[in-house]
Amino acid sequence: MTERTVRTSPLTSTLGRMLVALAASLLLGAGCSGEEAGPGDGPGTTNQCLSERDYFAKNVWAPVLAKTCTKCHAPGGQADEEGAKFTLLPSAYPGFVDANLAAAKLFAKTEYDGKSVLLRKPLGELEHGGEKQLEADSAEYRALEAFIQKVKNNDFCQGGSSVKGFDDVVLHDTLTTYRMATLNLAARLPNAGEIQRILDDGEQALEPLLDELMKEDAFFTRLKEMYNDMLLGDRYLGYSSYALNLLNKSHFPQAGDAWFETLPDAEKPKVNTAIAREPLELIAYIVRNERPFTEVLTADYTLMNPMSARVYNASLQFSNPNDENEWKAGQIVAKGNPANNEPADMVLPHAGVLSSPIFLNRFPTTPTNLNRHRARMVLKFFLATDILRIAERPIDPTQATSYNNPTREDPSCNVCHRMLDPIAGAFMKFNDNDQEKFEPNKNWHAAMFPPGFGKEVMETSQYGQALSWLAERVVKDPRFSLSVVYTAFHALTGEEPLAYPDVDDEGFEQKLASWESQDALFRSIGDVFVASNYNLKAAFKGVILSPYFRAKNTLGTPTPARQIELGAVGTGKLSTPEVLARKIQAVTGLPWARTSGGYKVHLLTTDYRILYGGIDSDDVTMRLTVPNGVMANVGWRMANEVACQTTAWDLSLSKHSDRFLFPYVTVDDTPESNAASIRKNIQYLHAHILGEALPAGDPELERTYELFVATLAEGQAKLASQELGASLSTACRARRNPYTEQDLPTDQRLEQDPDYTVRAWTAVISYLLADFGFLYE
């Protein structure tokens, strides 16, 4: 949609006039409600000439194997424990369809007396431990027969798919999509040049513009927010020495009395921030320089500024030793203890964020946990695998006493520990109590599964580099690229990726279609990410260009079944406190802030951060995505206070081209004297604040105009009865320059409102700032 750019100084009114003039034509160009859905069996349908993968998922996995076989043949199941070669991954495993297809094909081709083993075993033949599971005349058995015949004859469609498309979904137009992206990722609106490129080149302009957008400093601020939601290291910004207090002072003496404790109190927060945000700066460095994002785990370095380099005993040269914003790649050096057979200087074996002292402390271990918590985070963050979902089964606690080593011997336990413990072993060289303390002579626990990854066991000669050994294997796993897409998707949409539905769920077919569509898109984006040499920006672009970010409506009214299929598609994410704070400033020109220590402090990122659904990375680690009563009240307060502080200030600017909100009106304009300009400014405000390019006469514009007229009439009546005075309330006056805090010249001040127009416009701004279209993305 058409928008006015917000920078440190606003656009010229020429562009503003162009945007309003284009509103009607762009609306017509973007609308598709009159288009036909096209041929086929209905919106979103596809022909049923299926690829091998889709045929298996639809006709074999869901109705047969998932229901009949996985209970025993899953990892840790009875068949698996008894050494069965046929293993099926439950749907909680990313990539389970491909893995299970490979297993099914292998056994489909394996025959005994001319008949596939995959057909004999379910009938209880060939000493099947599970005995008879299917009848030969059942629909499930016939499905297996059909699959095996197709495998033998390679009778699958090349490129065929059961995945339903989005042909019945109406997407936001190119300009609206880009506006959404700029506000989310770069804290600004599109500028005049970008708008013109989109008007000239249409959809072809979007991807290059996104590439340029993701080079801006504001994008990296947003990127670090996104990854802090995962890593939660900002917990250690809680007080000025929180992060430093984590570090072992014998390994890092500069973190204590040798240097840090001698600093003035005003300087300590800078050092603390450098240590606390080290993993986030590493991520930003990798993305800024378009290095392979695999380095988030494999980097043999981390990022340091002059302060953190001193703490970490790193020999780095900086242009300015006092510049907290100068970051360089370097390696952490710990001071060793020769009495423990440690070298005087130990260069820690780096493995991206995994070896970061902040990561190790934020996800700590204990002498009994033995790094399993860290292993769970590796699986969750970088392999898209929730280990807690994989073993969702009843556990009899009394059975554990039947085993000397339950985590290895009890099937109820080892289903997770077989996957978890080898990864935990990669952290073996770190102290069980002093989280980041590296102990090169420490070894693993013989009672646990040996260090490794998947079915590969780590050689003991690799124990000294165990984390980097693990990292190299994690990033080569197909789940790594999927995890990156999951992170980008959640950050941009606020939604979690869909889980594979239960076959007994009501509406299973529709939920399955929804999952298949999303899974196909995620795998496609993951492939592009890998092909781009693991450039993280490719994953972000893939999500932004998808219907999950861009969808706004459907062609006509979808059927109840189609509504289920499209349930995860579309916009409507509640803005985070951080994003909303920047959006307010981008749109109005001023922050919703208070002054503290001579600085403007955003209220949404301080006083109201938790109340508006944000996190503190400590006690509150999950953002609220559905507003409650308190959040609604914060939104109303924001709208009222921002409208109060911005309206008179904007109207006081003599050059209309300098205004953010009122380029078409003056304080003297009333419905009687200049209704056309008032209507035009309202049309502009809908485009500027809400991203709505509405044609003149649209009901939404009429409602806003009626609000202005009604507020004006009510106020003028109270002025006439002297119930109200002409003076604006102190907080709403334009008396001081909000940027410089200096008093305005007398002739520029706007403190009186004899016609009540300032207050009527304040009501309009408050109304729009409290709108769903502003508070949500």
Which residues are covered by each model-predicted region?
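N-terminal secretory signal peptides that target proteins for export/translocation
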Residues: M1-T14
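Residue-level signal for mature regions of secreted extracellular proteins and peptides
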Residues: S25-L26, G42, A62-L65, P406-E409, ...
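The N-terminal extracellular segments of secreted preproproteins, especially immediately downstream
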Residues: E3-V6, G31, Q48, T68-K71, ...
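Bacterial N-terminal signal peptides
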Residues: R17-G29
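His/Asp/Glu-rich metal/cofactor-coordinating catalytic motifs and the adjacent surface-exposed loops
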Residues: E145, D155-G160, V169-T182, L210-Q465, ...
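Conserved S/T- and glycine-rich ATP-binding loop of Class I adenylate-forming
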Residues: M1, A187, A539
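Aromatic- and Gly/Pro-enriched helix-to-coil junctions and flexible linker segments
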Residues: C32-G233, Y242, R310, A446-L498, ...
